[in-house]
UniProtKB/Swiss-Prot annotation:
Stretches for region G1: 407-414
Biased composition (Polar residues): 68-82, 165-174
NCBIfam families listed in its UniProt record: IF-2, small_GTP
Protein name: Translation initiation factor IF-2
């Protein structure tokens, strides 16, 4: 016969291929869909399937449901009906002749074993009964014998006593009486000893019999245990030998036993309901009561059940406490309720709620008061361990100086640096001003110098402060024609705060109006004294445009660096500071890091503030890929988990997992401090909030190209807030304007400001659909000016009252329609109808209202000019007298602006 494949066989017998392959596998044959199947394999598979099917064909399971209604009493004396459904399952197994014969033999053996055990037990019980009867009989005989002996002895003693008494009564003397008393005492003593001996003899006999009975009982108990331990007598006999059938039979037995117990409980319930409360014991009555209540009552625990007793001795635990902990967390650490902790704190004089954060000292006092051992843990322990586990070199070498160029706006800082680097960076800056820190290192004939160019605008104070902290020497650029300006003074203050030496570059020396001596004089007023005047600062006259004095400036910088003896460890793990950071759409978070010590290599794990990551790529200031950077070298690194804050310390660590833990800890700590600062309510703030009126808010979503610019703009916008209009920055960040930013602006009714960034397509769609205000800027001046205009539009307008006319009342006429009409002469200005007026009497305002009627002769007119007569009717006022003055004015709205 031709072989067929598994797939064709499955199609022939109309079964899935996967199922047929599984059946082959169950039969012990591994097949795939394309394998051939022989006739022998078909027969093997068929036999396997028939064998499996045969196991199940002899088994029949029947289910039966019976429903009944039970009336049970409930609260209030009422009864309610409960539907009870009883489900019964019976399984019947068909036995084959072999199994039936084997089961019959097993049943016969079991019955014989039971009969034999029963006969042995009956014989043993009979022997024990005989022994007990013999022991009791012997005990009774001994008791009777002792009683008889005691009675006979007592009779003999009485007879002898009577005989002696009779003999002595005939002739009794005093010595005879004494002898008689002595004998009577001896007789009583003998009687007592005899009774004691008889009692001891009876007790000894009883003990011997009891010991014999106990020994026989122990022997019988051991023999019964040995017989019960035999497997053929203790095994659970089944009707069939099939494993599945036995399981079904056991399940059936369990259900039958459960039904028997259910019937027993139901019978008890019925008896309870009918009033028959003659239960066997108190436990039965409690069980019946629990069933009657529908299971809600608690059943008395049986004497055989174990019960857990609460330990009396208090458990002392080791409680680990951090710098801050809530009352609930402290209670969990001590395994007590929060209310107990609050009670202890109240006893110690501290009031707290369960969610209140308490400090480490308070938590320590509470835990020790409750008898626990306190282990204080520092929160930054992991951070200190990570920072200490670093490879740092030991040999310090000379390094290049880090020079920061500072000065006022447009004094030529970037142009000076451009000339040194022979590039034109200022042309790429919007408006010709530097918007963020630029870090560059240049090679000179005398050595390498790293320059940091800081913005000069007042808004970038924080950036300038960070630049001073990361620098060794400050080059203060002052224009010779402009002199000392506000940002120049600020730069001097930053340099002094950082204790950094200052080299003054007097720029624009080629201009005709240049006055270097004036610059020296002005700087000397702020503590920057030139060397020729006995000071410590070097003054160099330069021209960034013509290139004059550039070499002298570099020599002065290198000379100052030699005096400082700048050294750094070149080997080992790197340590640096983030100069600037931003989010690049294609490369992700980018951070400009100035290496302070060690060597930063590609692939190092860097921990930087709240962020961490592995350095995936490094570039220098010209955009070239590099693999390592030594001290005083600024580099751009990629691979951080987020955009770090400018000014954060960047440290290379060993373990990325620990770096992640430290970064997450810092984030959580910052969040806790921020929330605590927000939730802290001071008394003066409460009064200020109570007294301040309605304040308008200008919501802003700010996105910038770099972190430093974002911080500077945010700070400047916050300073624009007034008592009436406040600037609220609902969202800020680094990178392009995304759909999330637009959604946030729409939800908070904010305007979107983009500084050197643009919105993507999805964000523009939301801006158009929601009609949001989206504005782009490249110069900070324009941004601040337009925000001021927007805030000015939100200010409440001011109103000014301007007097436009004055009329003198000459006479008063009565009108049936308007009441008192004042006949007036316009002495100044113009009188207009429906304007506000004031009535003055003796130059005192006695009424302020509205001009209702204005007539000239009998005609209604809208206005009457100076030198003309008219009739004026004042609305809702009739007390007009001759000689009064009527002052006509109008209210003018004055638009306010923010200075």
């Amino acid at each position: 016969m031709t072989d067929v494949t598994v797939k064709s066989l499955a199609a022939e017998i109309q079964t899935p291929v996967d199922r047929l392959i599984q059946q082959f596998a169950d039969a012990g044959m591994t097949k795939s869909a394309s394998d051939a199947v022989t006739q022998h394999e078909k027969e093997t598979l068929l036999a396997h399937l028939n064998r499996d099917r045969g196991n199940a064909q002899g088994k029949l399971t029947l289910q039966r449901k019976t429903r009944s209604t039970l009336n049970v009493p409930s609260t209030g004396g009422k009864s309610k009906s409960v539907q009870i459904e009883v489900r019964k399952t019976r399984t019947y197994v068909k036995r084959d002749p072999i199994d039936a014969q084997q089961a019959e033999e097993e049943e016969q053996a079991r019955r014989e074993a039971e009969e034999q055990a029963q006969r042995a037990a009956e014989e043993q019980a009979k022997r024990e009964a005989e022994l007990r009867e013999a022991a009791e009989k012997a005990k009774r005989a001994a008791d009777e014998q002792a009683k008889r002996e005691a009675a006979e002895k007592a009779k003999r003693d009485v007879a002898e006593k009577e005989k002696v008494t009779n003999q002595q009564n005939e002739n009794m003397t005093k010595p005879a009486q004494a002898e008689k008393a002595k004998r009577e005492a001896e007789a009583a003593e003998l009687k007592r000893k005899a009774e004691e001996a008889a009692r001891l003899k009876v007790e000894e006999e009883a003990r011997r019999i009891a010991e014999e009975a106990r020994r026989m009982a122990e022997e019988n108990a051991g023999r019964w245990e040995a017989e019960s331990a035999k497997p053929e007598e203790s095994a659970d006999y089944h009707v069939t030998t099939s494993h599945h059938a036995r399981e079904a039979e056991d399940e059936n037995d369990r259900q039958v036993e459960g039904e028997r117990r259910s019937r027993s409980r139901a019978g008890k319930v019925t008896k309870q309901k009918k009033g028959n409360r003659q239960s066997e014991s108190k436990a039965d009555r409690e069980e019946a009561r629990a069933v009657t209540r529908g299971g809600k009552g608690k059943r008395k625990p049986s004497s055989l059940q174990q019960s857990f007793n609460k330990p009396v001795q208090a458990v002392n635990r080791d409680v680990v406490i951090g710098e801050t902990v809530t009352v609930a967390e402290l209670a969990n650490k001590m395994a007590v309720k929060g209310s107990q902790v609050i009670k202890v704190m109240m006893k110690l004089g501290a009031m707290a709620t369960i969610n209140q954060v308490i400090d480490q000292e308070t938590a320590q006092l509470v835990a020790e008061e409750m008898g626990h051992k306190v282990i204080l843990r520092r929160e930054n322990e992991l951070e200190e361990a990570v920072m200490s586990d670093r490879d740092t070199g030991v040999a310090a070498e000379a390094r290049a100086p880090v020079v920061t160029i500072m000065g006022h706006v447009d004094h030529g800082k970037t142009s000076l640096l451009d000339y040194i680097r022979s590039t034109k960076v200022a042309a790429g800056e919007a408006g010709g001003i530097t918007q963020h820190i630029g870090a560059y290192h240049v090679e000179t004939d005398n050595g390498m110098i790293t320059f940091l160019d800081t913005p000069g605008h007042a808004a970038f104070t924080a950036m300038r402060a960070r630049g001073a902290q990361a620098t060794d020497i400050v080059v203060l650029v002052v224009a010779a024609d402009d002199g000392v300006m506000p940002q120049t003074i600020e730069a001097i203050q930053h340099a002094k705060a950082a204790q950094v030496p200052v080299v003054v570059a007097v720029n624009k020396i080629d201009k005709p109006e240049a006055d270097p001596d004036r610059v020296k004089t002005e700087l000397s007023q702020y503590g920057v004294m030139p060397e020729e005047w006995g000071g410590e600062s070097q003054f160099v006259h330069v021209s960034a445009k013509a290139g004059t004095g550039i070499d002298e400036l570099l020599d002065a910088i290198l000379l100052q660096a030699e005096v400082l003896e700048l050294k750094a460890v070149r080997s080992g793990m790197a340590n640096g500071v983030v100069i600037e950071s931003f989010l690049d759409k294609g490369r992700g978070p980018v951070a400009t890091v100035l290496v302070r010590e060690g060597t930063l290599n590609k692939g190092d794990i860097v921990l930087c503030g709240f962020e961490y990551g592995r350095v995936r790529a490094m570039r220098d200031e010209l955009g070239r890929e590099i693999t390592s950077a030594g001290p005083s070298i600024p580099v751009e690194i990629l691979g951080m988990s987020g955009v770090p804050a400018a000014g954060d310390e960047a440290t290379v660590v060993r373990d990325e997992k620990k770096a992640r833990e430290v970064a997450l800890y810092r984030q959580g700590k910052f969040r806790e401090v921020k929330l605590a600062r927000q939730q802290k309510s001071k008394l003066e703030n409460m009064f200020a909030n109570m007294t301040e009126g309605e304040v308008s808010e200008l919501n802003i979503v700010l996105k910038s190209d770099v972190q430093g610019s974002c911080e500077a703009i945010s700070d400047s916008l916050q300073k624009l807030s007034t008592d009436e209009v406040k600037v609220k920055i609902v969202g800020s960040g680094v990178g392009g304007i995304t759909e999330t930013d637009a959604t946030l602006a729409a939800a908070s009714n904010a305007i979107i400001l983009g500084f050197n960034v643009r919105a993507d397509a999805s964000a523009r769609r939301i801006v158009e659909s929601e009609s949001l205000d989206l504005r782009y800027y490249s110069v900070i001046y324009d941004l601040l000016d337009e925000v001021k205009q927007a805030m000015s539009g939100m200010l409440a307008p001011e109103y000014k009252q301007e007097i436009i006319g004055l009329a003198e009342v000459r006479d008063v006429f009565k009108s049936p329609k308007f009441g008192a009409i004042a006949g007036c002469m316009v002495t100044e200005g113009i009188v207009k109808r429906h304007n506000k007026i004031r009535v003055l009497r003796d130059n005192v305002v006695i009424y302020e209202g509205e001009l209702e009627s204005l007539r000239r002769f009998k005609d209604d007119v809208n206005e009457v000019r100076n030198g003309m007569e008219c009739g004026i009717g004042v609305k809702n006022y009739n007390d007009v007298r001759p000689g009064d003055m009527i002052e006509v004015f109008e209210t003018i709205e004055i638009k306010r602006t923010i200075a």
